[in-house]
Curated annotation (Swiss-Prot):
NCBIfam families: aroQ (TIGR01088), PRK05395.1-1 (NF003804), PRK05395.1-2 (NF003805), PRK05395.1-3 (NF003806), PRK05395.1-4 (NF003807). Substrate binds at residues 73, 79, 86, 100-101, 110. It is an enzyme of class 4 (lyase). This is 3-dehydroquinate dehydratase. Pathway: Metabolic intermediate biosynthesis; chorismate biosynthesis; chorismate from D-erythrose 4-phosphate and phosphoenolpyruvate: step 3/7.
Length: 148
């Protein structure tokens, strides 16, 4: 089983950017922790971050047939990117949307997701634990699906 963790714009600044909202851990430390967890579960995990919408779309396209599911923190693209939504849907790869902060408790423009309605699930508001919860959720989903 192989998973892809995609992180969108500004997430490369985690630990420095608004730590009162996004926490003090770096993206690298989150990826290391999740990679260790994946290894313990016998799951492959590839991590990728880009500030560019087109690069994220290309990466999703390149993942077709290579990954079983995607964990995606699309950052601000969650609220604006029809291209990212279309890439996820056309790839036909199950995905979980995740966010560090509770986007529904923030500004109105952050309360709309263009990805959520087609996601397997959405995890939001648990800080860095959102990554672990999303990982566990998609892992359970894939394992249960394979039993059917």
């Amino acid at each position: 089983m192989n998973l892809l963790l995609l992180n969108g714009p500004n997430l490369n600044l985690l630990g420095k950017r608004e730590p009162s909202i996004y926490g003090s851990q770096s993206l690298e430390s989150i990826e290391i922790s999740l990679s260790q967890r994946a290894k313990e579960e016998g799951v492959g995990l590839e991590c990728f971050q880009s500030n560019s919408e087109g690069t994220l779309v290309d990466y999703i396209h390149q993942s077709i047939g290579k990954v079983d599911a995607i964990l995606i923190n699309a950052g601000a693209y969650t609220h604006t990117s029809i291209a990212l939504r279309d890439a996820l849907l056309s790839a036909e790869i199950p995905y979980v949307e995740l966010h560090l902060s509770n986007t529904y408790a923030r500004e109105t423009f952050r309360q709309k997701s263009l990805l959520a309605d087609r996601a397997i699930g959405v995890v939001s508001g648990f800080g860095v634990m959102s990554y672990q919860l999303a990982f566990q959720g998609i892992l359970d989903y894939l394992r249960n699906r394979s039993k059917e």
